[in-house]
Structure formats: C-alpha cells, structure tokens
C-alpha cells in the first residue's frame, strides 16, 4: 500500500485529471457490467449484448459516467457514500429484475416502484432463486467498490474544486440529455411498439427502463375537452341496444377471480391420473363459457381484476402496473350496482395492503373489504388461507344481507411459485414421457393438486348458492397462466411453448385463461361460446343481470356486440381484425376517468362509501366484565361486535394476548404485580386489528374505561 501511495503522490497535477477520468470510466464500466451480467444472467450474455448493441452499450456507459461526474464537486466523504449507494442500488434492482423475469417472464418497470411491499412479501417464497453466486457476486462488488473508492479519494483531491465543479455542471447537462432522450440508445424513434422483454434485450437495462419511463407519460388525446366528452357520452346513451334492463330483477352477482387457474390438460405431452378440474369442466360444458385473453403472465393479478371491475383496458395505458393510476374515484361495477340497490363487498384471503387493494376498493365504490386479517382461525394450504374458507365467507355474506349482493371474490391458495411444500404427502397426479427435470415434475404436480382444491372450492360455492335459492349468477375466470418454473420450464419441457413467444399463436397460448358464467335463472337460454379480454367482462355481467349501465360500460358493450371482443397487443391488431380508430371514443373516456377532468362523471355521485370498513363491520365494545381470578390476576371478558381471532386487545395502550370465543366475545388476563394503585385507578380498554408489521392499526374499536376494584 505504501508503494501505491508513493506512486500516486508523485503524479503530476496535469495528469491527475486524466487519471480521475480513467478511474471514473473504469468505475462506470464496472457498474454497467454489474447491471447487465446480473440482469442477463451471465457474463457471456453481457459481452454479446455489448457487441451486438454497441450504441446502447456506449450510451449506457456514458449515462453512468456522467452520473459519477455530476457528483465530483461534492466533499469526498459524501461522494464516496453516494457512489457506494449507486452501486448497491444497481445491484439490487438488476437482481430484482432478473428474478422477476425468472418468475413472470417480465423485467423491471417504472411501476414496480409502486409495488415494493408486494415484491418484498413474495420474495420470502423465492429464497431458492438467490444462491451462492449472487452472494459471492455481492461480496466481490463490495471489495471492488473499496478499490475504486481508494483511487477516487487519491485522484479527486488532486483536481481543483473549480475544475470539478465545471465537470459536474457539464455532466449534469449531458445526464439530462441522455435521460430525457431514450431514442439515443438506438438512434431511432420509439414510436413503434417494442415488447418490454425485447427492448431490455436490445437496449440494455438502462435504455429500456428510460424508454418505459417516457412511455408512461400519457399524452392528452387530441380534442380532449368537456364538449368532446359530453358528445361521446350523449352518443353512447342514445345508441339503441338489444339488452333488456329490468329494475325489478335483482339477482345476486358473484365474480370470482380464480388465482392462476388454467386448464393443465392443454399440456398434451403430460399424462394426468385424473382431471383436476372435474366440477369446473362440467360448468363449462353446460353454461356459457370460453376463454379470456388476459394481458399478464404469472402475476399482475390486480391488472386483470381492475379491468373487469372498471371496464377500462390496460391496452390503452403504458406497460406498467395499472392500479398505480387509480388515485381518485373511478366508475366500476360496485358504483353501478350500488346505485341500483346492491350491497358491494370485496372478499380476498390475502393481505389488505397487497396491490393497495384496501385503498382502491374504497375508491371504486365497495362498502367493505374482507381481507385475510378478518378471517377467524382459518385453515391454510401452505402459506395461504384455504380457498374453501373464502367461499364459505362469500356464502355467509349472501345470507347475512338484505337485498341483492355484488361480491368480488379473489382466491389466493393456488398462487405461485410452486416449488415450496404445501402438502404433507404430494400425490403424483401428472407424469410425462418427455424429458423433465425433477423440479419441473414437482412444480407440475403441486400445481395440479392445488387445482383440485380450487375445483372443490368452486363446487362448494355453487352448491351453496343452490341451497340459498336466490336468483344468482356466478362468473369465474382465471387471471393469468400459472408460473410453472423459471423461463417457462414446464411449458417448454412439455413443448407447450415452442420457439418465439412473440408470434401470435404462442401469444394466445400464453395469455388465454378459462371463463364460465353460471346462473340459476337463465332457464333454457342458449349457451354462449365466450372469448373476450377482461375489459369486456364487466359490461357482459351487467347485460346478463339486466342492469342499467354507465357510459363506459355501455360503450364497452356496444363494441363487444359489434363483434370486437378482443383488444390484443397492438402487434396483433391485424390478426384480430382490429382497427384502432374503433377504440377512439373508448380511449377518450378512459383518459377522462384516469388522467383527465372526469367530465363523463358529471351529475353522478362517485364518492367512496361513507361507512367503508375492513371486515364485517365496525369493531365495537359494548361492555367489559372484570373478574378477579387470583391474587393480582384479572380476567377481562369483552362483549361487543365484529371481533376477529387475529385482533389485539390494548389496555392503556399495552398489547395483551387475546382468547377468541366468537365475533361477540373475546377475553384476556392481566396481572397486577404488587401495585395497588393499578387496582384502584381507571384503565382504557380497546380492540384493534393490526397489519402484519404488528404496528399499523387497520381497524379499531371504541374504548371503554374499567376499574379492577
């Protein structure tokens, strides 16, 4: 080290600037290598990209180089801290993008910044995707970061502050130009639609990401104003329709999103011991059914769900998470049906905050939301609450309310990935003569067994509805194909996906899920063969139930009735016979709802339900009975309403263990250790349901004052 110090100390000031630039260049190349090697999965893939996409490689390097340059004017300790944070940031983000691709066939997008909670939560199920290579890579990164820090410290102080300030100003200007002009990464326009995965392959992580950021800025449509929206709404309302509206007919409407439900019998090279979906298949054979062409694979559930509920299409938005755009009330099935006398309830056996459902369900008009925190002592399949418990909750809700119900039911027990242990003994239901890895065999069998449970939960719901004997329709759809192994392992090993996934036939296979519409009031009505994208399902449901529609659903229905039931990727408009001009009014109303002034909502009260609540209803304490059991120990019996087994009792703000008897009675014990003042003084008792961080209160009761004596 002394030798290096001596060598550095003898460097002439005229050369120090050059050496600082060389160090910054080496550091930028090092950072770029980290990003692309991790993101692409190998060093060889990084070299191939640098050779085949030289322009993108150079622009990525320059952006990182100018990023370092922009920080040169800072004090050394701050400069070193920031470049260390930069390297660690790129390491984590590129690794996250790589893992996302392994799981869902998609890379990191700007909207993933809105889903950090979801990513962190699901990552607990994916620890096997981070192995010794990633750990060694991180350690090596830190060591090399230390080496670069040494040279930066030495060379930086040899360059005057004035020169460093000028370099920083120049770097900021260059950085701004590159960041706001992603077309520089290819020297061409991005007006042509390029699939996200393909853009990451060609333009690199940085270039593709900046491209998506640019696309995320939704331009105001031509001619968008109040007059134009009113003209569209008037035209929609005056369009004649064959659909019958009957205000006196009020069937219950249950919409079931079946997590990752797909027909595995489509895997022709797999041999199944039995059909894992016998009940569901019977429904499809006897009732209107078919397929839904979704826009997500292996994940992105809430995109599909929101399309169904809102009548809007993700095909009119950038390739990003749809729900992050819902930050104000928007029209939905919940609003439309509540206006016609329905109760609107969402039920989901997973966490309230996942996909920010708790907030968005309120914005789109639901009255209450049952999330997993409000299920009492549920049984589990692996890490998830059994869907049969979910269906029983839906049946209970039907019987409890007066008047018609709209239930949005979202399952979760069949959620991927499928390399974990969920059953004590996993029956072998699927085999194949094809060459499959042991992991792929396990994944296929676990998924097949989970489908059996999904099928049984559907049976429980339908048979339960029959017993209630009220006019009811049940719509069941799969939100996306299951994630069956990294890089589509099961699909490829069984030759289901073949070759280029960007061709039309492979596209349909990758995004097509089952759909069925069951009812007990249709009589001998003709069975329909259904094929649609999720945005058309909401208006189909309203028409089938003979309900009035709002403008967005009426327009959706008009387009559907004209035979345009699919809005695919723009790449495949020709194959589907789609003319973009046909969607001009549709896109205009969607912009008005999400980004515009909501002119189309004039004279409509789209205010969230005033009494919106999580769970069955507001938690309420009616009374607290105090009983002394032995010296200094007291038992508290708390009587009230809507208690849940996962609640927490607070006495003077201190958590106490709960004994759950039922929704009207919970208990706890408290020990007073030799403090007579606590026995004679007053104490505040309350009940709350906490988020999974154990701190955040998501629902709480009133408080009651008690005395132990």
Residue positions per predicted region:
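Solvent-exposed soluble domains appended to multi-pass membrane proteins
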Residues: 237, 241-247, 258, 263-637, ...
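Extended, solvent-exposed regions of the mature portions of secreted/cell-surface glycoproteins
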Residues: 643, 660-663, 679
């Amino acid at each position: 080290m002394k030798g290096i110090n001596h060598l550095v100390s003898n460097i002439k000031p005229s050369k120090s600037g050059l050496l600082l630039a060389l160090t910054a260049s080496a550091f930028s190349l090092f950072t770029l290598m980290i990003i692309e090697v991790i993101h692409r999965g190998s060093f060889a893939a990084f070299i191939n990209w640098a050779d085949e996409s030289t322009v993108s490689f150079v622009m990525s390097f320059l952006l990182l180089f100018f990023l370092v340059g922009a920080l040169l004017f800072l004090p050394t300790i701050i400069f070193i801290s920031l470049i260390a944070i930069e390297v660690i940031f790129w390491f984590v983000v590129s690794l996250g993008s790589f893992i996302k691709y392994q799981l869902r066939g998609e890379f990191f997008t700007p909207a993933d910044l809105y889903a950090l909670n979801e990513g962190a939560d699901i990552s607990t199920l994916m620890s096997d995707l981070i192995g010794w290579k990633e750990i060694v890579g991180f350690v090596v990164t830190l060591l090399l970061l230390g080496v670069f820090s040494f040279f930066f410290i030495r060379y930086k102080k040899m360059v005057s502050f004035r020169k460093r300030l000028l370099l920083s100003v120049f770097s900021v200007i260059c950085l701004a130009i590159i960041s706001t002009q992603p077309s520089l990464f290819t020297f061409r326009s991005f007006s042509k639609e390029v699939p996200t995965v393909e853009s990451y392959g060609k333009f690199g992580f940085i270039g593709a990401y900046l491209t998506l950021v640019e696309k995320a800025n939704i331009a105001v449509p031509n001619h968008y104003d109040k007059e134009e929206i009113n003209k569209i709404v008037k035209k929609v309302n005056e369009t004649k329709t064959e659909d019958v509206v009957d205000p006196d007919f009020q069937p219950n409407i249950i919409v079931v999103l079946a997590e990752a439900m797909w027909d595995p019998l489509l895997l022709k090279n797999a041999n199944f011991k039995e059909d894992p979906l016998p009940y569901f298949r019977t429904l499809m054979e006897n009732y209107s059914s078919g397929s839904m062409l979704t826009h997500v694979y292996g994940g992105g559930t809430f995109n599909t769900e929101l399309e169904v509920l809102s009548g809007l299409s993700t095909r009119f938005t950038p390739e990003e998470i749809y729900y992050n755009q819902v930050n104000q009330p928007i029209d939905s099935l919940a609003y439309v049906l509540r206006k016609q006398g329905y109760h609107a309830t969402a039920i989901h056996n997973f966490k309230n905050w996942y996909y920010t459902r708790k907030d968005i369900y309120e914005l789109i008009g639901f009255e209450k939301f049952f999330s997993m925190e409000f299920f009492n002592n549920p049984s589990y399949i692996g890490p998830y609450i059994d869907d049969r418990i979910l269906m029983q909750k839906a049946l209970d809700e039907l019987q409890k309310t007066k008047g018609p119900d709209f239930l949005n039911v979202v399952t979760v027990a069949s959620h991927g990935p499928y390399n974990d242990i969920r059953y004590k003994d996993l029956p072998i239901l699927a085999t194949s003569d094809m060459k499959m890895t042991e992991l792929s065999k396990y994944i296929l069998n676990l998924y097949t067994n989970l489908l059996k449970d999904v099928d049984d939960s559907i049976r429980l719901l339908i048979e339960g509805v029959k017993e209630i004997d009220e006019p009811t329709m049940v719509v069941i759809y799969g939100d996306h194909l299951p994630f069956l192994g990294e890089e589509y392992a099961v699909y490829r090993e069984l030759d289901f996906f073949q070759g280029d996934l960007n061709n039309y036939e492979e596209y349909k296979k990758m995004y097509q899920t089952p759909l069925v519409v069951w009812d007990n009031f249709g009589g001998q009505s003709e069975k329909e063969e259904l094929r649609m994208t999720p945005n058309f399902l909401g208006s189909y449901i309203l028409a089938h139930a003979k309900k009035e529609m709002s403008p967005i659903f009426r327009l959706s229905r008009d387009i559907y009735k004209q035979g345009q039931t699919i809005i695919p990727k723009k790449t495949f408009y020709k194959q589907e016979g789609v003319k973009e001009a046909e969607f001009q009014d549709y896109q205009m109303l969607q912009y008005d709802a999400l980004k515009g002034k909501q002119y189309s909502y004039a004279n409509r009260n789209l205010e969230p339900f005033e009494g919106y609540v999580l769970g069955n209803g507001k938690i309420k304490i009616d009374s607290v009975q105090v009983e002394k059991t032995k010296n200094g120990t007291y038992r508290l019996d708390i009587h009230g309403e809507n208690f849940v087994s996962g609640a927490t009792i607070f006495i003077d703000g201190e958590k106490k263990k709960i004994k759950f008897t039922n929704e009207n009675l919970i208990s706890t014990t408290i020990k007073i250790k030799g403090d007579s003042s606590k026995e004679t003084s007053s104490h505040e008792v309350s009940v709350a349901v906490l988020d999974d961080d154990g701190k955040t209160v998501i629902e709480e009761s009133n408080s009651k004052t008690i005395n132990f004596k």
